[in-house]
């Protein structure tokens, strides 16, 4: 009997350990509230969901956030911002324009119109600048401080087109301490992802700078049945960001940011007759790496975008005044054989 009781206790302990591990795994990289445990102490999570730095526990808004290595792991496979879909409860993102023009849905609310001029109820804010046009919303994510997904109407603080919520992206800013990194990864279909950054002080406690760069690429991996050649699926995506932070006094901060992006590749691949009537299952007409396109242009996509932002902050002890001036532009084209 004693041996049986000991065995049962061991099995119970093992079962509890497995259940505990499974429950922890389900939390995912995004958490709300997120609790980071270091040496037995819970690290405080700071967010800017109300346009000021606050502890996540003190913000009366539904916010999911993540930072650091979680973000690196999320985008190390050369994924774009659509990678957030499925990782954040209540958020879905998709695009019918390849690596451009994403559409966001928060708690089921969104706009399915694929017109590039259509407004959306989910806004993307990058470094305090509203990326209103869908072409601007796909700027590559790299050298990130954190991402905050704010659910629910946010018009009071962030203005129009925030009926469903906000995706708020904050990149790493310049600092006096010299720091930097470089990361690289390689995957199937010749997929490569290389990004890095370096920054530090130029004038002690007065002027600092940071330069970040990214290069992503993939080879053609989809065969066009009409030609027998692998001529679809490729992309070359490069981006660079330069920041200059000037703090002439303890009360004045000026941040100048310039970023550019160049994309060349294949747009979305559309397929026909891959479902049977009355069924949601893919039929034998669907082959992941084979399509039949007889057009002259093979779904080309090319975009160039750039943006300049000046962020001025004046501190008045109990309050602060901010001025954000930004000019964003994008030019390009995308074609798809439907």
Question: What residues fall within each predicted segment?
Answer:
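Non-catalytic regulatory/gating segments with a bias toward low-complexity or hydrophobic composition
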Residues: 63, 71, 84-85, 147-152, ...
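Residue-level signature of outer-membrane beta-barrel architecture
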Residues: 126-128, 171, 200-202, 244-247, ...
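Transmembrane beta-barrel wall of Gram-negative outer-membrane proteins
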Residues: 179-181, 186-268, 306
